[in-house]
C-alpha cells in the first residue's frame, strides 16, 4: 500500500491535565502516514483522487485547535478517526504526536503513536428527516460525525449549552445563518468555525456532506 506522509507538523493547542496546561497553548508535533492507493492520482494528475496533504494539515490543525485535549492519546485517536472518515481512499492512518514540553529538563519529549484501520472504527449510521448522520467516534469528551443533508433539505437542531461544535463542508453546497459554508478550510486558518450553525440547508442538486465535532464542556476530568 502506498503511503502519504506529513513529517513534523507543528501546532499550538491546549493539551494536558495540569492547571497551567488547561490555560495556555503548548507546541505539539505530529507525524502522519495515510495508507492509500495513489495510482489513480498519479496517472490522472487529479488531486481529488488522493488525500491532499495540504488539506489534511488544515483539518488536523482545526481539530486540535478546537478540542482542548486532556491526553495526547485521545488526540491521536480522534485524528485517526477523523482522517479515515473524511478521506474515503485512505485505508489506514498512522498518527504520532510528540509533546516537547511534557518532561522539560528530563527528556526531549513525550509521544504516543497509534496505527488505525477502518475496522478499528465501526461507524453507526442513523437515518434522519434531513438525511443521515454517521458517528465516526464518540469519547467522553467529544463526538466526531459526518452529516449528509439531502438536496433541498434542512438540518435544524436546538442550541446545546453543554457543548460546542466545529464543522466544515466536505462536498456539495450548504448555507447557515451566517451564509454559505466553505468546502475547504481557509489557508492558514486554525479552524473554520467554532460556532457551527444550528440550522443548515443543502443547496443545489447534490447532497451536502459535512464533518462535525461536538466538544462537551466538562467541569472536571
Feature-to-residue mapping (PLM):
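Asparagine-centered strand-capping/turn motif at beta-strand->loop junctions
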Residues: 198-205
Amino acid at each position: 500500500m502506498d503511503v502519504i506522509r506529513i513529517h513534523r507538523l507543528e501546532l499550538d493547542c491546549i493539551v494536558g491535565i495540569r492547571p497551567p496546561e488547561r490555560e495556555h497553548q503548548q507546541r505539539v508535533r505530529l507525524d502522519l502516514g495515510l495508507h492509500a492507493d495513489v495510482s489513480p492520482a498519479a496517472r490522472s494528475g487529479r488531486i481529488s483522487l488522493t488525500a491532499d496533504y495540504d488539506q489534511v494539515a488544515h483539518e488536523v490543525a482545526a481539530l486540535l485547535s478546537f478540542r482542548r485535549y486532556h491526553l495526547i492519546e485521545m488526540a491521536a485517536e480522534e485524528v485517526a478517526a477523523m482522517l479515515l472518515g473524511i478521506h474515503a481512499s485512505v485505508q489506514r492512518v498512522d498518527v504520532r504526536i510528540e509533546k516537547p514540553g511534557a518532561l522539560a529538563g528530563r527528556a526531549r519529549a513525550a509521544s504516543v503513536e497509534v496505527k488505525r484501520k477502518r475496522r478499528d472504527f465501526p461507524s453507526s449510521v442513523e437515518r434522519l428527516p434531513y438525511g443521515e448522520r454517521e458517528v465516526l467516534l464518540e469519547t467522553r469528551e467529544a463526538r466526531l460525525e459526518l452529516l449528509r443533508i439531502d438536496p433541498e433539505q434542512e438540518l435544524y437542531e436546538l442550541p446545546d449549552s453543554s457543548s460546542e461544535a466545529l464543522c466544515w463542508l466536505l462536498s456539495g453546497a450548504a448555507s447557515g445563518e451566517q451564509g454559505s459554508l466553505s468546502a475547504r478550510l481557509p489557508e492558514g486558518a486554525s479552524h473554520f468555525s467554532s460556532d457551527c450553525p444550528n440550522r443548515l440547508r443543502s443547496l443545489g442538486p447534490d447532497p451536502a456532506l459535512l464533518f462535525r465535532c461536538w466538544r462537551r464542556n466538562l467541569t472536571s476530568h
